């Protein structure tokens, strides 16, 4: 954890912290249950969190000896806040839950008139029941409880949540009624804050100002997902979407922003937001990372889950590109491949230290 804190504060570090993702081998000792069962039994959800969450494997941590933290979350998908906006989530077979929009679209007027008591909603109750089970297990196994961090669930962000409910109409409304969209996003942000306040007492984050999501440590107390920003201009983000993000980050005492895809068109605007403390990339390789890193270093905003290529790791050149301020994740072919790459990475770090 100390290595993470050093990197997240742009301090000198022996090496960049790294995690390894890979598919579960058919002959692996620990096999995840099919996804459908995690929604039927909290013990299965708990087990799968340890065996294979985001293709990260806490059960292999002692073999790889990487920097994977031991974290578990109520894994009820991306629909928790969206479930409060008028459409119940659906879940079938091994798919993750989703929102199926109705034939009659939900409008900005519908969002504005909503009066929600979040405790009455089934998805909120599901998460609370999962938290309660997790705490029963931790209480029964106190040594494990000392190791594990129970985190917030995936609450998305105001823009991604409203997009789930409204679909393409949201983007039309952003052009025709930008102020009403901004107000709707702020309403969704307030609902998200209610969820945070309800779930936070169940979380066991140990260091104020830092939290865990996506199998890694962040600087900030909340991760706002902003995948849908890849589809809008920086100006639209700044004028319409950012106020909701700023509200949340101020309310929680600082936060992080996440986006998958190619997001470098908007990072300059995001790095100026009040309250932003780190930035998580789902697909760093799609972006101009050298330009992003220069700006991040200037603003002291650490970059989370940058994905190096194999040669950068085994040669150690990744440390020349990013001396600090970056955490890494590497997509391996298998557990054995992860072990080999990590050993090569550590040898490269040691060679550089001796120069």
Residues covered by each model-derived region:
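A short glycine/small-residue-enriched secondary-structure motif
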Residues: 23-36, 75, 97-112
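Aromatic- and acidic-residue-enriched carbohydrate-binding clefts of CAZyme catalytic domains
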Residues: 88-110, 217-231
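N-terminal accessory alpha/beta regions
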Residues: 56-90
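Active-site loop segments of alpha/beta catalytic cores
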Residues: 1-40, 53, 57, 65-72, ...
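Outer-membrane beta-barrel proteins
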Residues: 45-47
């Amino acid at each position: 954890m100390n290595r993470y804190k050093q990197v997240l504060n742009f301090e000198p570090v022996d090496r960049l912290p790294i995690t390894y993702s890979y598919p579960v081998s058919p002959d692996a000792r620990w096999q995840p249950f099919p996804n459908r069962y995690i929604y039927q039994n909290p013990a299965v959800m708990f087990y799968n969190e340890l065996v294979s969450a985001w293709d990260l494997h806490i059960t292999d941590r002692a073999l790889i000896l990487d920097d994977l933290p031991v974290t578990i979350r109520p894994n009820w998908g991306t629909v928790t806040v969206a479930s409060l906006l008028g459409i119940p989530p659906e879940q079938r077979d091994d798919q993750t839950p989703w929102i199926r929009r109705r034939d009659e679209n939900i409008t900005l007027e519908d969002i504005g008139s909503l009066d929600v008591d979040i405790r009455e909603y089934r998805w909120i109750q599901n998460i609370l029941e999962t938290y309660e089970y997790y705490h029963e297990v931790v209480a029964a196994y106190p040594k494990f409880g000392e190791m594990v961090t129970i985190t917030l669930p995936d609450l998305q962000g105001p823009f991604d949540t409203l997009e789930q409910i409204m679909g393409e109409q949201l983007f039309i409304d952003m052009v025709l009624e930008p102020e009403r969209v901004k107000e709707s996003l702020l309403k969704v942000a307030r609902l998200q804050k209610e969820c945070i306040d309800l779930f936070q007492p169940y979380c066991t984050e140990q260091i104020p100002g830092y939290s865990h999501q996506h199998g890694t440590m962040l600087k900030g107390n909340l991760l706002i997902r902003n995948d849908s920003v890849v589809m809008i201009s920086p100006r639209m983000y700044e004028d319409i979407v950012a106020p909701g993000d700023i509200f949340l980050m101020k309310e929680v005492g600082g936060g992080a922003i996440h986006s998958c895809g190619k997001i470098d068109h908007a990072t300059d605007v995001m790095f100026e937001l009040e309250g932003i403390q780190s930035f998580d990339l789902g697909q760093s390789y799609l972006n101009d990372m050298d330009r992003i890193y220069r700006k991040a270093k200037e603003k002291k905003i650490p970059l989370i889950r940058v994905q190096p290529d194999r040669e950068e790791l085994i040669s150690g050149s990744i440390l020349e590109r990013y001396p600090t301020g970056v955490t890494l994740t590497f997509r391996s072919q298998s557990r054995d491949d992860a072990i080999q790459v990590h050993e090569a990475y550590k040898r490269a770090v040691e060679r550089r230290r001796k120069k």
